[in-house]
Amino acid sequence: MVLIRVLANLLILQLSYAQKSSELVIGGDECNINEHRFLVALYDPDRFLCSGILLNEEWVLTAAHCDRRNIRIKLGMHSKTVPNEDEQTRVPKEKFFCLSSKNYTLWDKDIMLIRLDSPVSNSEHIAPLSLPSSPPSVGSVCRIMGWGRISPSKETYPDVPHCANINLLDYEVCLAAYPEFGLPATSKTLCAGILEGGKDTCVGDSGGPLICNGQFQGILSWGNDVCGYILQPALYTRVFDHLDWIQSIIAGNTDVTCPP
């Protein structure tokens, strides 16, 4: 899946790590066409960029680093080249960030809410994904998916989304994996992957979901440039910690502040 970096650190990150905004799931298989009705594709404006998650008929959640001026959002998409009959396209009406300056970091506030220009209708290939009702537990099996790169180091992208199962790891595993970034001792991000390597999100998967034990718990933020590398898991924005912010904005309270 896609490995995307935080805007504030883009220049540094591009030297050695890949942003997940354009990566595919490594070590996965083609997703069942009925498994990802909530998964949306973000284009800039005609080039595939990131994934996102449909929360209801007019709101999409994704990573802040996926923001571009001319985003187009495709819903109900499976194949990039063969459209579903119920596929729909929207553009943002409004975009909301945890910080108005969009100064997110590698460990904080890489989250963006998009209000669509018009509501979408549920259909065979379009349906929302519920927000989590409880926090995730370390050791959970988590589902990842996206149209990101499917080769660890080559520019190989699929026509359809790929899915894989990984594990939710202790945050300390990511602290040890990326000492050069000086990650804080605690964070509103989740650490997930396979310690032995082989399965991972990659470039192009950014903004996509981490679904643990059936609940939407994370948004892909960033990871190692060589996807699926041993002891190099990826980091995901923790959705549960941002519930009040998300729900308040959807309810119309746009003055709400992000969790500290």
Swiss-Prot record:
Gene Ontology cellular component terms for the protein in this record: extracellular region; secretory granule
Record-listed E.C. numbers: 3.4.21.-
Tissue: Expressed by the venom gland.
Signal peptide: 1-18
GO molecular function, one term: toxin activity
Disulfide bonds: C31-C163, C50-C66, C98-C258, C142-C212, C174-C191, C202-C227
Sugar-bearing residue positions: N103
Function: Snake venom serine protease that may act in the hemostasis system of the prey.
Protein name: Snake venom serine proteinase 12
Organism, as annotated: Crotalus adamanteus
Lineage, highest ranks first: Eukaryota, Metazoa, Chordata, Craniata, Vertebrata
